[in-house]
Amino acid sequence: MAGDPASDPHSVVATIQPAITLLGLGIGAALASRALRLNPIVGYLGLGFALSGLGMAQLFNGPLVAAMAEAGVMFLLFNLGLHFSLGRIRAEAGNIFGFGSLQMLVAGGAFAGLFAAFGLPLAFAVIAGFAMGLSSTAVVIGLVRERGQEDCPVGRAAQSILIFQDIAAILLLVAAGALASGGALLPELGMAGAKALAAFAIAVLFARYLTEPLFGLIARAGTTEVYTATALFIALAAGWATGMAGLSLTLGAFLGGMAVADSRYRILVQTEIDAFRGLFLSFFFISVGLSINPALLIEDWLLVLGVTIALITLKCALNVAAGLVNRWSVPGSIQLGFLLGQGSEFALVLLALPAVAGLAEPRLVAALVAAIAISLAVTPAISNIGRKLAGRLRAGPPDAKLAGDDAPVLIIGMLPAGRAVADALEFNDIGYLALEADHDRFQMALADGYHVHRANPADPRSWDA
C-alpha cells in the first residue's frame, strides 16, 4: 500500500542502515584483529568503544541491531546445546549442578557480601553480587571453540558451569522483576523453576519423538536450503517460546540445540548454523563496546580502573578457590578460574534494570557496567595468562597411571585428532602416553590438562626413552 510505512524504501533503508554500517565496520575490525594476532572479540569490542567515543552510540541503538545481537547469543547457546545430548547432561550433571552451583555460591556470595559490607541495600547486594558472579557465555564459549577445548577437562567444566549460570541468571532476572513489581519473591522463583522444568521436558519429548522424523522428512525433500531454514527456525523458535513464557531466550535456544543433539543430523545442523552464529555474535560484542561511556572513563578513570582490577582479580581468585574446593588440581583450577574471570552480558542486563540500578548511586552502577565491558575485552589475555601459568605448574612429573611406561595407548601429536583420541581414552579411564614435537602445541596441551611429553616421534631415540 502506498501509505504503508513498511513499503517506503526510505524507511527500509533507514531501518537497515545501522546494521549494514556495523557489518562493514565489523569486517574491518576482524581483519585488523587477525593482522595484530588478537582475538576478533577484542576487535569488535574496540570498534564499539571507538564508535561510542566518537559520540555515535545512539546511531546504533535501534531495535534491529539489538535483535541481531540477541540472536548471536541465542545461536551460540543453540550451538552449545548441540554438544549436550541427554546422555552428556547425565554424564556432566556433577559439573553442571555440583561445580556450577559451588562456583555461584563462592563467587556470587563473596561479591554480595562485599556489596553489603560497603553499606549498599541488601536487595542490590544480593542481585548485583550474584550477577557479578556470572561469567560471559558468549566470550568463554567463543574462546573454548577457537582453541579446540570443547572436550578437554577445562572446556567441559567451563561449558557446564556456564549452563548452570544461565539458569541462575534467569532466577536473578525473576528476582529483579519481583523487586520492580513489589511482588513476593518466592512464588515468582517457584513459577520460574516450574516453567524451566516444563521447557526441559518439552525439549526431551521433542528430541525423543520428533527430531528424527522431522529431519528425515526434510532429507527426502533433498533441498539444502530447507535444512538451513529448519535449523534457524528451531534455534529462534525455541528462544521465542521460552521468552514468551517469561524465561530467557538463551535458555530456549540451548534446549533447542539439546533436542537435536542426539539425532543423526546434528553435524549437518551445526554446519548450517555456524555462519549465522559468527555473524550475529559480532553485533553482540560491538553492542557491548557501544555501552561503555568514554566520558565516565575520563572523568572517573580511577574508580573504573579500581573496580575493573578488583572485579577481575577477585573473580579469578574466587573461581580458583571454587575449583580447589571441588577437588580440582591447582593447575586446572587456575586455568578454569582465569577463563571464567570476566563479567557477564547478563550482569549488564541486570544492572540496566531501573529496579536494580535505582538502589545504588548512578556513578557506582556506571563504573560496574564499564568494568564488566572492559573485563570482556581483556578476557583473551587474562585467559592466556592462566593457561601459561597452569602449563608451568603442570610441567612436573606426569601422572604415573595415565602417562607411565605401561600406558596401553601411544598418541603421536596433539592436533585436534590427537586431542579427540585423548579425550575418548580419558572418558573411558584408559591410560595413554602422548608425544608432541611442536613446543607451542606441547605447552597448550599441557595447560589443557593432557598427559603429554615433549618429544619428536620421528627421532628413533624417542622410542628408546
Identify what each model region corresponds to.
Residues 1-416, 422-423, 458, 462:
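Transmembrane helical cores of multi-pass secondary ion antiporters/exchangers
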Residues 409-465:
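A solvent-exposed beta-alpha-beta segment
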